[in-house]
């Protein structure tokens, strides 16, 4: 499960890179939604064919989410077997730092579920926003129109022009949670997340009994924490600069194309 969870991110990272390029970087360069549409169509020939979309987009996403949920269930089962499901009052819990277990003797009921980390929590939130994004931009056109050949950056711009509040909430959540989850996820895979943290208490970072070395370790943890969070903020800002700064301001589509877009949004209760 751990390998599936990890290796599924490789294909998703390639897709995400292409998607950021076409929905943010290229619009930033061209400063125009119509001028950017052609590049998006070219990219679709790579990741939106009948063969590549299931293999390199849909399957990795499904595998990543399913394996993440399965890992939590497995760890819960292991906790129950290790500490005994019949004695929840003495179920060990993670300390406030989340690094180690400590036995409880206060008689309160404890959960066997593993602690929900920031990476996991952001992943579940991201999955919800991503599901809505896929439903509106991919599944809805297929269901209503039979294909999605007319769906592109102009469709997104039309959504922002017609329903700005819903669109901004959806895309801010998608970009913020998505970039945070992906950056911290990769930091975990390469071993940086385990060395990052702002907390500087002895329980969190431990002690070497050398005051100078302890200070250096705490400073290093904080530097790594700042670098990872800074990378997440930078990634979000780059994506938002083109996506929200250019595409979202592209204005509504007109003519029969605009009518098609209105009918699609009306199908999910977003009519005028």
Predicted feature residues:
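Membrane-embedded alpha-helical bundles that constitute the cytochrome b-like, heme-associated redox core
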Residues: 1-272
């Amino acid at each position: 499960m751990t390998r599936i969870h990890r290796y599924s991110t490789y294909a998703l990272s390639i897709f995400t890179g292409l998607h950021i390029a076409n929905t943010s970087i290229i619009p930033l360069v061209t400063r125009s939604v119509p001028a950017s549409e052609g590049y998006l169509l070219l990219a679709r020939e790579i990741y939106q064919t009948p063969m590549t979309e299931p293999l390199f987009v849909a399957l990795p996403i499904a595998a990543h989410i399913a394996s993440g949920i399965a890992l939590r269930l497995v760890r819960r089962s292991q906790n129950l077997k290790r500490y005994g499901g019949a004695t929840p009052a003495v179920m060990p819990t993670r300390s406030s730092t989340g690094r180690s277990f400590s036995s409880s003797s206060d008689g309160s009921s404890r959960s066997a579920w593993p602690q929900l980390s920031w990476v996991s929590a952001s992943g579940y939130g991201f999955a919800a926003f991503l599901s809505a994004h896929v439903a509106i931009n991919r599944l809805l056109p297929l269901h209503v129109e039979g294909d999605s050949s007319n769906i592109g950056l102009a469709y997104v711009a039309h959504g922002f022009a017609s329903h700005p509040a819903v669109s901004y909430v959806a895309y801010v959540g998608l970009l913020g949670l998505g970039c945070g989850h992906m950056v911290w996820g990769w930091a975990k895979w390469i071993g940086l997340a385990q060395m990052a943290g702002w907390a500087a208490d002895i329980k969190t970072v431990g002690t070497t009994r050398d005051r100078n070395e302890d200070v250096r370790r705490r400073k290093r943890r904080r530097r790594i924490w700042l670098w990872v969070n800074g990378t997440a903020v930078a990634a979000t800002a780059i994506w938002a600069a083109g996506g929200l700064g250019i595409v979202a301001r592209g204005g509504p589509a007109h003519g029969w194309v605009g009518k098609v877009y209105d009918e699609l949004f009306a199908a999910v209760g977003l009519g005028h």
